């Protein structure tokens, strides 16, 4: 699951995952409120599975990434999903907050395409090497 409001970054996420051989069907949410509603819906339903990984932007409309992360971590069904917080922010406070909310990894979005592709390696590591 990708929670990202920038279509260019969503494209780069797909490229990074594909470059590392990860075959995933990405669900994309463009704002935090929609992502929170989805997690709450998953908690209410017995049959739907949680995503295996969440790639979460911090600066989102309607509800920021940290609100989404709080919701995920308090979820009875999806609370243990690996979450990679990805942001263009270099603020130490953002990294500290992500760590305090139990994000599994923090990825600062680079301006270089080649460096952005390293997100795929991080996702692969979070998924335990599955393809």
Language-model regions: role of each:
Residues 1-18:
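Conserved acidic segment of CheY-like receiver
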Residues 44, 66-79:
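Short amphipathic alpha-helix used as the core "switch/output" element in two-component signaling
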Residues 109:
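A Lys-centered signature of the CheY-like receiver
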Residues 28-53, 116-117:
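Acidic, metal-coordinating helix/loop segments flanking the phosphotransfer/catalytic sites
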Residues 56-57, 87:
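Active-site residues of response regulator receiver
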Residues 31-34, 64-70:
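Acidic catalytic/metal-coordinating carboxylates
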Residues 61, 91:
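The feature encodes the CheY-like receiver
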């Amino acid at each position: 699951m990708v929670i990202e409001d920038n279509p260019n970054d969503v494209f780069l996420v797909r490229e990074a995952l594909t470059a590392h051989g990860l075959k995933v069907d990405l669900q994309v949410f463009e704002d935090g409120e929609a992502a929170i509603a989805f997690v709450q819906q998953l908690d209410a339903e017995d049959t739907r599975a949680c995503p295996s990984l969440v790639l979460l932007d911090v600066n989102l409309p309607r509800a920021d990434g940290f609100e989404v992360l709080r919701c995920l971590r308090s979820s009875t069904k999806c609370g243990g999903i690996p979450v990679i917080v990805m942001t263009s922010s270099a603020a130490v406070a953002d990294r500290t907050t992500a760590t305090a909310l139990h994000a599994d990894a923090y990825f600062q979005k680079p301006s270089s395409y080649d460096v952005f592709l390293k997100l795929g390696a991080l996702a692969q590591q979070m998924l335990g090497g599955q393809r």
